[in-house]
């Protein structure tokens, strides 16, 4: 691995002007492309303190063997050159927005003599117009079925088209007027293309014009007493309206805008964009990408900048053949934050569009509400991505193998247990222990602990709490292992008799050393112990001064992160439950023999604890299920200063 000091340029040799830089590996391959307002400031930050760089950035700097740069006149030129180089070199450490091929789109093959409407999944191609994506293929077919009444464009494959051309007879859609039958010459090539262009215009948001035209034609036919044609036009108008109703108005001013939102965790970010044309949502797209890691720029600003540059640059290269509109760049782009070079980005986008493009953060009204909806979609997309990735067998196998190799284990850790501590300023201190087997959660084995020795009187010691939980968990393991009566009839271990291959604690060196010391004290030597620290996602092992840095895109780190997050969730859930019970506790809780149902009956009967406190034994025994002994115990609990509680 190259030493960054061997290729670090002298700060004085780096220009202060804006420009674009490239990192190359020892084989000369470009592994990262970036741009900067000041090349000297940005490049110096990569080498100033490598230990404090984000893991992905640190890996890039230590993988590279050379850095070079190109000076440009303006930041807009730097933006364009960065985009071109990323397209040319496809650097491994750059975030790339690739099409999500899992959702179907409506494709219009404008590159054919007789364009076709079809359901499509796959990479975008030049000369093909796309609308969507849609959640289901049937949603596309339903839309096409409605609109081909008005825009009878071809929907058949090339094989079907040629066959009907040979037999000189249209298909069924041609007979019922849902296809203009260009295969038999019913319309010319130019007429059919006009039909397709009108179809595309309608889906692009120019809906009102066609609705007005149909209404005018219908009225004219009725005035000419051509009622059959008027009825057909009426049905066509109804079909258009039903298609329009499927896309509700979200912006009352009829704005053309793209609304962008992000959701992220420690490793990845989900990107969602809603395409609004004519005030209606015409499409939705999403990606999940690795988080960018430039050392001196906020993550959200980097996400906004990189998304705008790559997405709209790609759309412009398709020559307007995208699903967003005839012009792939809308008049307005709504983003969660404005990057520092927002003016330059706006100028670049304006150049792509040919007219002014505004970047804006929505603050109120319909646009703010829509941005919040897109944000919720981004969060849901990230969650679905995490669940899908965790459930994939190949990914889980790779994750376990990654962990085995990174930690130097003899075998893959098929059973992983993780401990997390939760409290609020030392109160209600609890711990959780979650179990993953074969990379998936085994929720029946989850346990929670109320911390006894390491907490109390508003104090909490996370290190001591980790040690206490570890001791209790593995003492149970040893006791169940030594007592055959605790085994099930099938010989399977109950509770904690089955030890983990890997024991994970939430924290750094102090926590992992505490857990390791307990295992050593108990004589357990076949359980590996690690700590996973937050923020930098460092993996700590006992008695080692430095952590292990696993690649941020590795399946192994992803699994460890998910195990840790699940332990955190389970601990917080138990902590909230315990805190809620404490805050809602009453003096009645301590009355022996008084269960929850009879407590509720008493409070319901008297209306409050204060009124119950003023009652007599006879009044309390009037409540169904309450005897004299219980009534006396209730009054003793409520009136500790009055012996016997008698009144």
Curated annotation (Swiss-Prot):
<dbReference type="InterPro" id="IPR035901">
    <property type="entry name" value="GIY-YIG_endonuc_sf"/>
</dbReference>
<dbReference type="GO" id="GO:0009381">
    <property type="term" value="F:excinuclease ABC activity"/>
</dbReference>
<dbReference type="Pfam" id="PF14520">
    <property type="entry name" value="HHH_5"/>
</dbReference>
<dbReference type="GO" id="GO:0003677">
    <property type="term" value="F:DNA binding"/>
</dbReference>
<dbReference type="Pfam" id="PF08459">
    <property type="entry name" value="UvrC_RNaseH_dom"/>
</dbReference>
<keyword id="KW-0228">DNA excision</keyword>
<dbReference type="GO" id="GO:0005737">
    <property type="term" value="C:cytoplasm"/>
</dbReference>
<comment type="similarity">
    <text>Belongs to the UvrC family.</text>
</comment>
<dbReference type="InterPro" id="IPR000305">
    <property type="entry name" value="GIY-YIG_endonuc"/>
</dbReference>
<keyword id="KW-0227">DNA damage</keyword>
<comment type="subunit">
    <text>Interacts with UvrB in an incision complex.</text>
</comment>
<keyword id="KW-0267">Excision nuclease</keyword>
<dbReference type="InterPro" id="IPR001162">
    <property type="entry name" value="UvrC_RNase_H_dom"/>
</dbReference>
<dbReference type="GO" id="GO:0009432">
    <property type="term" value="P:SOS response"/>
</dbReference>
<feature type="domain" description="UVR">
    <location>
        <begin position="208"/>
        <end position="243"/>
    </location>
</feature>
<keyword id="KW-0234">DNA repair</keyword>
<dbReference type="InterPro" id="IPR003583">
    <property type="entry name" value="Hlx-hairpin-Hlx_DNA-bd_motif"/>
</dbReference>
<dbReference type="InterPro" id="IPR047296">
    <property type="entry name" value="GIY-YIG_UvrC_Cho"/>
</dbReference>
<comment type="function">
    <text>The UvrABC repair system catalyzes the recognition and processing of DNA lesions. UvrC both incises the 5' and 3' sides of the lesion. The N-terminal half is responsible for the 3' incision and the C-terminal half is responsible for the 5' incision.</text>
</comment>
<dbReference type="Pfam" id="PF02151">
    <property type="entry name" value="UVR"/>
</dbReference>
<dbReference type="Pfam" id="PF01541">
    <property type="entry name" value="GIY-YIG"/>
</dbReference>
<dbReference type="GO" id="GO:0006289">
    <property type="term" value="P:nucleotide-excision repair"/>
</dbReference>
<dbReference type="InterPro" id="IPR004791">
    <property type="entry name" value="UvrC"/>
</dbReference>
<keyword id="KW-0742">SOS response</keyword>
<dbReference type="InterPro" id="IPR001943">
    <property type="entry name" value="UVR_dom"/>
</dbReference>
<protein>
    <recommendedName>
        <fullName>UvrABC system protein C</fullName>
    </recommendedName>
</protein>
<keyword id="KW-0963">Cytoplasm</keyword>
<dbReference type="Pfam" id="PF22920">
    <property type="entry name" value="UvrC_RNaseH"/>
</dbReference>
<dbReference type="InterPro" id="IPR050066">
    <property type="entry name" value="UvrABC_protein_C"/>
</dbReference>
<dbReference type="InterPro" id="IPR036876">
    <property type="entry name" value="UVR_dom_sf"/>
</dbReference>
<dbReference type="InterPro" id="IPR010994">
    <property type="entry name" value="RuvA_2-like"/>
</dbReference>
<feature type="domain" description="GIY-YIG">
    <location>
        <begin position="16"/>
        <end position="95"/>
    </location>
</feature>
<dbReference type="InterPro" id="IPR038476">
    <property type="entry name" value="UvrC_RNase_H_dom_sf"/>
</dbReference>
<dbReference type="GO" id="GO:0009380">
    <property type="term" value="C:excinuclease repair complex"/>
</dbReference>
